UniProtKB/Swiss-Prot annotation:
ZnF (unnamed) residues: 3-34
Function of the protein: Negatively regulates transcription of bacterial ribonucleotide reductase nrd genes and operons by binding to NrdR-boxes.
Cofactor(s) needed by this chain: Zn(2+)
Species whose genome carries this gene: Geobacillus kaustophilus (strain HTA426)
Sequence similarity: Belongs to the NrdR family.
PROSITE patterns per UniProt: ATP_CONE
Protein name: Transcriptional repressor NrdR
GO molecular function: ATP binding; DNA binding; zinc ion binding
Keyword Cytoplasm: no
UniProt domain ATP-cone: residue ranges: 49-139
Top-level taxon of origin: Bacteria
Stored InterPro entries: ATP-cone_dom, NrdR-like_N, RNR_NrdR-like
C-alpha cells in the first residue's frame, strides 16, 4: 500500500477491525518513511449493481454518490456523519439483498427520502426539493403537508 502523502510503498498496519457487520475491514496504517497515518478499507468485491436513470441511461451504483447527497441535505444540521454512513450502508445492503442486477434511480431516491424523514425533517425537505424537482411553491407546500401528516401518525 502506497502512502497517500509521500507515495512510499512501505506502510505498516497499526490496527485492524471488522466494520459494516463484518462485511469489510478497517485498517489504520502508518508510512514507514514519513510516519503519516491513514485509514484503508478492505471490502468484498460484489457484482456490479447498475442504476437506471430517469432518462434511461445506465451507470454503476455509487455508495459515495448517495453519501454526498445525504451530506449536502444535512449541511449545517445536527446529523453525525456516522449516521449518514450507516444510512448509505443500509441502502446498499437492501439493494444488494434484492438480488437484482439493475435498480431504478427513483427507487434509490425514495429509499433515501424515507430514511431522511426519520432523521431530520429539514434535510428531508432539502433532499426532496432537489430529487422531486419542485417546479413551484405549491408543490413544495404539498410535500410539507405530507411530511406533517406522517409526523402526526
Amino acid at each position: 500500500m502506497r502512502c497517500p502523502s509521500c507515495h512510499h510503498s512501505g506502510t505498516r498496519v497499526l490496527e485492524s477491525r471488522p466494520v459494516e457487520e463484518g462485511r469489510s475491514i478497517r485498517r489504520r496504517r502508518e508510512c514507514e518513511q514519513c510516519h503519516y497515518r491513514f485509514t484503508t478499507f478492505e471490502r468484498i468485491e460484489e457484482p456490479p449493481l447498475i442504476v437506471v436513470k430517469k432518462e434511461g441511461t445506465r451507470e454503476e451504483f455509487s455508495r459515495e454518490k448517495i453519501l454526498r447527497g445525504l451530506i449536502k441535505a444535512c449541511e449545517k444540521r445536527p446529523v453525525a456523519l456516522e449516521e449518514l454512513e450507516k444510512v448509505t450502508q443500509e441502502i446498499e445492503r437492501e439493494l444488494r439483498n434484492q438480488g437484482v442486477s439493475e435498480v431504478k434511480s427513483e427507487t434509490i431516491g425514495e429509499m433515501v427520502m424515507e430514511r431522511l424523514s426519520h432523521i431530520d425533517e429539514v434535510a428531508y425537505v432539502r433532499f426532496a426539493s432537489v430529487y422531486r424537482q419542485f417546479k413551484d411553491i405549491n408543490v413544495f407546500i404539498e410535500e410539507l403537508k405530507e411530511l406533517i401528516k406522517k409526523g402526526q401518525r
